[in-house]
C-alpha cells in the first residue's frame, strides 16, 4: 500500500474530511490555511484563505456547495466550495472547536471553547435567514457550563447533535428546543473525535482514555469498545466492511523524547464486531490526529502531527480478507 502524500500545511493537521461523494478531501491544520484536494490522485484543487489562526474543524454540506470552517481566530466561516469565496463570517468570543452542516445543509452548528472567562456555547444558525448571520444572532444558543465540548456531530435527520466533552461525557441536544435529550459517561477522559457510520445509525468516539467506543446514535447505548495502549485521537467506521480505523499516539509534549517505534504512530485496524485488531499501517512521524474512510470504503486517509496527510488505497488482499472468528 503506497500512500499518496499531501503536503499543504506547515503545522500539524487538526481535521480531515471527505465530501459525501468522496472526490474531494478537505484538510485543516494549526495554520490558517484550509486546503481541498482531489482524493483520487492527491492533486491540490485550491485553498480557502481568510482565517488568521489555527483552524480546528471543517465540514462540507450534502451537495458540496458550501464549506464550513471553525478557527482559533474566534470565527466560523462559510465558503463557496467551488470558487473559494467567503460567503459568511460569524464572530465568536472564543475559539470555535467543532462545526457541522445538518442533513439538508440549511442549518449550521458550531461550538466554542471555554476560555478567557467565556462559557462554552453551541450555536445554531439557519442559513435560509440571512439576518441571523448579519446580526450575529443564532436562532438557538445552548450553554455548557460544566465541561467544554471537544467534539460534536449532527445526529440522523438533523434532529439533534451528539456532543462529546472534556470530562468524557456524551450527550444529545435537540436542534429544535436546545434541551438535553440524554447524557451518558462511558469514557473517563476527554473525547477527541466523534464520527458517524455511513447510515447514521451508530457513531464511534475516540478518547484520551486509550479507547474508542461504538454507540447507537439515537439511544446512546454503548455497543463495543476498542482498546489500545495510547490516547486515541481519531476513529472512523468503514462504510462497506465491519472495520474500524483508529489513529493516535502519545501527547504532543511527550513526542520528542521517544523513538518512532515506541511512539506507536500507526493507524490500527479493528474488527467492528469482534473488537480484535487485525492490521496496522505505519507512516507518520508523530501522532495521527485525524483519520477518515473514503465513502466508497476503498481507501482511507490520515492526517498527522507532522503536517502531512496520507491517502492510502487498499490492496486487493484487503477486500478478500476473511476474519477468522
UniProtKB/Swiss-Prot annotation:
This is Eukaryotic translation initiation factor 3 subunit I. SUPFAM superfamilies: WD40 repeat-like. Signal peptide: none annotated. It holds the Pfam family EIF3I. GO terms for molecular function: RNA binding; translation initiation factor activity. It is found in: Cytoplasm. Component of the eukaryotic translation initiation factor 3 (eIF-3) complex, which is composed of 13 subunits: EIF3A, EIF3B, EIF3C, EIF3D, EIF3E, EIF3F, EIF3G, EIF3H, EIF3I, EIF3J, EIF3K, EIF3L and EIF3M. GO terms for cellular component: eukaryotic 43S preinitiation complex; eukaryotic 48S preinitiation complex; eukaryotic translation initiation factor 3 complex; eukaryotic translation initiation factor 3 complex, eIF3m; synapse. The gene is EIF3I. Component of the eukaryotic translation initiation factor 3 (eIF-3) complex, which is involved in protein synthesis of a specialized repertoire of mRNAs and, together with other initiation factors, stimulates binding of mRNA and methionyl-tRNAi to the 40S ribosome. The eIF-3 complex specifically targets and initiates translation of a subset of mRNAs involved in cell proliferation. WD repeats lie at residues 8-47, 50-89, 144-183, 186-225, 283-324. Belongs to the eIF-3 subunit I family. InterPro entries: eIF3i (IPR027525), WD40/YVTN_repeat-like_dom_sf (IPR015943), WD40_repeat_CS (IPR019775), WD40_repeat_dom_sf (IPR036322), WD40_rpt (IPR001680). It comes from Taeniopygia guttata (Zebra finch). One of its GO terms (biological process) is formation of cytoplasmic translation initiation complex. Keywords: Cytoplasm, Initiation factor, Protein biosynthesis, Repeat, WD repeat.
Amino acid at each position: 500500500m503506497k500512500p499518496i502524500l499531501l503536503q499543504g500545511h506547515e503545522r500539524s493537521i487538526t481535521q480531515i474530511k471527505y465530501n459525501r461523494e468522496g472526490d474531494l478531501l478537505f484538510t485543516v491544520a494549526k495554520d490558517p490555511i484550509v486546503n481541498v484536494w482531489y482524493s483520487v490522485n492527491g492533486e491540490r484543487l485550491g485553498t480557502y484563505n481568510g482565517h488568521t489562526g489555527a483552524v480546528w474543524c471543517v465540514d462540507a454540506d450534502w451537495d458540496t456547495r458550501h464549506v464550513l470552517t471553525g478557527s482559533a481566530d474566534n470565527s466560523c466561516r462559510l465558503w463557496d466550495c467551488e470558487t473559494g469565496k467567503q460567503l459568511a463570517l460569524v464572530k465568536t468570543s472564543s475559539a470555535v472547536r467543532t462545526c457541522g452542516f445538518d442533513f439538508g445543509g440549511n442549518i449550521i452548528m458550531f461550538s466554542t471553547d471555554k476560555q478567557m472567562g467565556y462559557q462554552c456555547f453551541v450555536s445554531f444558525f439557519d442559513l435560509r435567514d440571512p439576518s441571523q448571520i448579519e446580526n450575529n444572532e443564532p436562532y438557538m444558543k445552548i450553554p455548557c457550563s460544566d465541561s467544554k465540548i471537544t467534539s460534536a456531530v449532527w445526529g440522523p435527520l438533523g434532529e439533534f447533535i451528539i456532543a462529546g466533552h472534556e470530562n468524557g461525557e456524551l450527550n444529545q441536544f435537540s436542534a429544535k428546543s436546545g434541551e438535553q435529550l440524554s447524557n451518558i459517561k462511558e469514557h473517563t477522559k476527554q473525547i477527541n473525535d466523534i464520527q458517524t457510520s455511513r447510515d447514521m445509525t451508530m457513531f464511534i468516539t475516540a478518547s484520551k482514555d486509550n479507547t474508542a467506543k461504538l454507540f447507537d446514535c439515537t439511544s446512546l447505548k454503548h455497543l463495543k469498545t476498542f482498546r489500545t495502549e495510547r490516547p486515541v485521537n481519531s476513529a472512523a467506521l468503514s462504510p462497506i466492511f465491519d472495520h474500524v480505523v483508529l489513529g493516535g499516539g502519545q501527547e504532543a509534549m511527550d513526542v520528542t523524547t521517544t523513538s518512532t517505534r515506541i511512539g506507536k504512530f500507526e493507524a490500527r485496524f479493528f474488527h467492528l464486531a469482534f473488537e480484535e485488531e487485525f492490521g496496522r499501517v505505519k507512516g507518520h512521524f508523530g501522532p495521527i490526529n485525524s483519520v477518515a474512510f473514503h465513502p466508497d470504503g476503498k481507501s482511507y486517509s490520515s492526517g498527522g502531527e507532522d503536517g502531512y496527510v496520507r491517502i492510502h488505497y487498499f490492496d486487493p488482499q484487503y477486500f478478500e480478507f476473511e476474519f477468522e472468528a
